[in-house]
Amino acid sequence: MEFFLDTANLEEIRKAKAQGLMDGVTTNPTLLSREGGDWRKQAEAICAEVEGPVSLEVVGESAEEMIREAEDLASFGDNVVIKVPMTNEGLVATESLYRKGVKTNVTLVFSPLQALLAAKAGATYVSPFVGRLDGIAHDGMELIRQIRTIFDNYDFPTKILVASIRHPMHVLDSALIGADVATIPYSVISQLAAHPLTDKGLAAFNADWEKLTK
């Protein structure tokens, strides 16, 4: 299972990279706006820092606008993946970009049928948002199970990229179901190594070592 970092913050990217926990990065307009300054320079810096895929999102509403923006964003680096919204126009753009050999990440997916359409259009990744579904009293992880079943039934090469992850259990459930990628905020990825029994065990070992060396 791959871990992507859901951020536009270079410091977070470097920390996760140093831990060996980052296979790629996903961004969106909101994340880039939080960093301030020139978004183009920030996006280019991220592409230069990250060896794996970097998702950069188009904001146009028509397929023509999305394709035009995608061509610009693709110039930021060979590792750019174009984030496209799950709309009818987005599907047109996805299919066109697929024919041109441009990798895409269809985002804002909330149903298995949306994921199926994205896969048929040639999406490289599909991003179901589990946390947002949980937030409206739906089972976000059930969506991942349904998409996994559909993709396995028909051997779609499209990767399931679990998004809107809000806590470590989302990561665990994604791994158990067999999702290909989880894109994780740094605030969550920094919790994955923690366990109270690990802390308790270390404290006991250290206390015993101090006794031994006195």
From Swiss-Prot:
GO cellular component, one term: cytoplasm
Presence of keyword Transferase: yes
Molecular function GO terms recorded: aldehyde-lyase activity; transaldolase activity
Domain of life of the native organism: Bacteria
Keywords: Cytoplasm, Pentose shunt, Schiff base, Transferase
UniProt pathway: Carbohydrate degradation; pentose phosphate pathway; D-glyceraldehyde 3-phosphate and beta-D-fructose 6-phosphate from D-ribose 5-phosphate and D-xylulose 5-phosphate (non-oxidative stage): step 2/3
SUPFAM superfamilies: Aldolase (SSF51569)
Entry annotation: catalytic residues: K83 (schiff-base intermediate with substrate)
Cell location: Cytoplasm
Catalytic activity: D-sedoheptulose 7-phosphate + D-glyceraldehyde 3-phosphate = D-erythrose 4-phosphate + beta-D-fructose 6-phosphate
Enzyme Commission number(s) of this protein: 2.2.1.2
GO BP field: carbohydrate metabolic process; pentose-phosphate shunt
Enzyme class: transferase
Gene3D superfamilies linked: Aldolase class I
Function as written in the Swiss-Prot or TrEMBL entry: Transaldolase is important for the balance of metabolites in the pentose-phosphate pathway.
Stored HAMAP family: Transaldolase_3b
Family under the similarity heading: Belongs to the transaldolase family. Type 3B subfamily.
The name this protein goes by in its record: Probable transaldolase
